[in-house]
């Protein structure tokens, strides 16, 4: 494999450095145009080696780990375009460090805050919403709380306690995606079995006024297992995740339900009581669907599984469900119509996506996780993009 030498060199360098590099972010990094941070990883005999790498494009090229920020363990990337900085979380030590990239392309570490004293036991992916350069919210489903912190001064300002009833015995409490409008941010709360094969009925909607930090919680019994959320022209859409149709396919109503969509229209702060949407009506019969993301053109990108080949026996695991024949489709919001199958072969379920103004990428990873290529599915044919050693965990545009 063409990256074999690069992989060995990258692992050797990472283990020798132990933590991070002082090398520039890259000789070809431009101070103009888009800038992305790619979080990827390689498995080594000493554990997972993580790389945070700056790049100006996702459309082509090979990622060079010789200039990456390198960390062991299970770190997280927290970032948002336009802030001028990003944060890397140490999941084991529950610490968050602020980083910038200087004019010469160096990663510059700033201050660090610890969430350990606030009861946080581990740091989740995509758990932070940046309301402004000086105000961020970390959602913690393990302790039913939201931690408010200042990313510029790197201090915790307060902890917002959510009702203890959101944590259910013998269930995994899950917080869905952040989605926001001016002055307010939302996420949903759902509950799955500890084996991730059933989803409890109903959900809770958490709304935070980002000016006053006032919290409002409402319940809804029409959908369950909401994960993906998006703001499309001021209307907030909430889509059920992959476990709910899995549970329904195996256990019926006791395990889940077909895909389900709720919305909050402009000017309102709770779900529209007169509207429930679905992806299924526009997709082929005999399939189940789950939304992955909504792109900048108002298309919801969906993974669709062929139920004739998906396992349905009692005791089927989510891993077996993920390994079924999944294809990529996109539908147009707000009608959830104009269904188009993307130019890709059927394969295993993958939740990774990243969009730009003119492309939509999924990841194609080797069976041994040694190499990954981003694949643009936005056109009539699949187009290979950025190639990298190992597997990709997250990509965020910071400029």
Predicted regions and their residues:
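C-terminal motif of bacterial Sec signal peptides marking the signal peptidase cleavage site
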Residues: 15-18
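Short glycine/acidic-enriched loop and turn motifs that connect beta-strands
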Residues: 42-45, 90-94, 142-145, 192-196, ...
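Post-signal peptide N-terminal segment of secreted/secretory-pathway proteins
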Residues: 51-148
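Beta-propeller blade signature
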Residues: 53-55, 148-150, 154, 199-210, ...
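Beta-propeller fold detector
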Residues: 59-71, 106-118, 156-169, 215-221, ...
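Repeated scaffold domains used in trafficking and secretory/extracellular systems
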Residues: 70-82, 118-129, 167-178, 221-232, ...
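Short, conserved, GDST-rich strand-edge loop motifs in beta-rich repeat architectures
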Residues: 187-201, 239-256, 303-323
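Intrinsically disordered, low-complexity segments enriched in Gly and acidic/Ser/Thr residues
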Residues: 275-368
């Amino acid at each position: 494999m063409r990256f074999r030498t690069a992989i060995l060199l990258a692992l050797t360098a990472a283990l020798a450095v132990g933590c991070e590099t002082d090398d520039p972010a890259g000789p070809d990094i431009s101070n103009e145009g888009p800038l992305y941070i790619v979080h990827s990883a390689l498995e080594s005999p000493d554990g997972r080696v993580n790389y945070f790498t700056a790049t100006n494009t996702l459309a082509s090229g090979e990622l060079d780990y010789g200039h990456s920020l390198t960390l062991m363990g299970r770190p997280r990337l927290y970032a948002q375009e336009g802030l001028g900085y990003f944060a890397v979380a140490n999941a084991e030590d529950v610490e968050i460090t602020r980083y910038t990239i200087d004019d010469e392309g160096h990663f510059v570490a700033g201050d660090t805050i610890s969430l350990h004293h606030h009861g946080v036991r581990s740091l989740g992916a995509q758990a932070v919403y940046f309301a402004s350069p000086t105000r961020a919210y970390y959602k913690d489903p393990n302790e039913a709380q939201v931690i408010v912190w200042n990313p510029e001064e790197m201090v915790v300002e307060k902890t917002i306690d959510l009702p203890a009833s959101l944590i259910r015995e013998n269930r995994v409490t899950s917080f869905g995606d952040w989605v926001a409008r001016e002055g307010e941010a939302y996420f949903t709360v759902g509950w799955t079995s500890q084996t991730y094969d059933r989803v409890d009925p109903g959900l809770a909607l958490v709304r935070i006024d980002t000016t006053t930090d006032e919290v409002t919680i409402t319940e809804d019994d029409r959908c369950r297992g909401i994960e993906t959320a998006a703001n499309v022209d001021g209307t907030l859409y909430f889509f059920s995740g992959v476990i709910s149709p899995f549970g329904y396919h195996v256990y019926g109503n006791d395990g889940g339900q077909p895909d389900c969509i709720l919305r909050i229209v402009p000017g309102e702060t709770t779900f529209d009581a007169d509207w429930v949407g679905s992806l299924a009506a526009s997709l082929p019969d005999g399939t189940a669907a789950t939304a992955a993301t909504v792109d900048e053109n108002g298309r919801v990108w969906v993974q669709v599984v062929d139920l004739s080949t998906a396992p349905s026996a009692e005791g089927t695991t989510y891993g077996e469900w993920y390994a079924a024949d999944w294809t990529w489709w996109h539908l147009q919001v707000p009608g959830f119509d104009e269904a188009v199958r993307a130019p890709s072969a059927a394969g295993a379920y993958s939740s990774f996506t990243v969009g730009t103004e003119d492309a939509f990428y999924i990841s194609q990873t080797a069976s041994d996780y040694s190499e990954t290529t981003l694949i643009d599915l936005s056109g009539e044919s699949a187009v290979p993009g950025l190639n990298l050693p190992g597997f990709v965990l997250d990509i965020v545009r910071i400029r």
